[in-house]
């Protein structure tokens, strides 16, 4: 696969699971002889929600919740066919969203 790069974007709510999955992908790619750029941490997307504490009165009494989405990017430079096969067979943790672009 000369001249091609594989870009892998990972998203998760828990950064520990995300880092473990990233390490697993990096070790698999290095074992098959591919070069890796990254992991590059992307900005964390924070989504905040504000709701009333009480359903009837006290408009000033509110509660805030937030949802953080952590992201990482990996580039695999000049992958071998063994690298692609190993990445397809890889079983990552639940809760990690993986996008692969060739």
UniProtKB/Swiss-Prot annotation:
Keyword terms: Ribonucleoprotein, Ribosomal protein
Database matches in SUPFAM superfamilies: Ribosomal protein S10
GO MF entry, a single one: structural constituent of ribosome
Entry's Gene Ontology BP terms: translation
GO CC entries: ribonucleoprotein complex; ribosome
SMART domains: Ribosomal_S10
Pfam family, one: Ribosomal_S10
Top-level taxon of origin: Bacteria
Alphabetical list of InterPro entries matching this protein: Ribosomal_uS10, Ribosomal_uS10_CS, Ribosomal_uS10_dom, Ribosomal_uS10_dom_sf
Alphabetical list of Gene3D superfamilies matching this protein: Ribosomal protein S10 domain
PANTHER family hit by this protein: 30S RIBOSOMAL PROTEIN S10 FAMILY MEMBER
Protein family per UniProt: Belongs to the universal ribosomal protein uS10 family.
Oligomeric and partner information: Part of the 30S ribosomal subunit.
Role, per record: Involved in the binding of tRNA to the ribosomes.
Protein name per Swiss-Prot or TrEMBL: Small ribosomal subunit protein uS10
Organism taxonomic ancestry: Bacteria, Pseudomonadati, Pseudomonadota, Alphaproteobacteria, Hyphomicrobiales
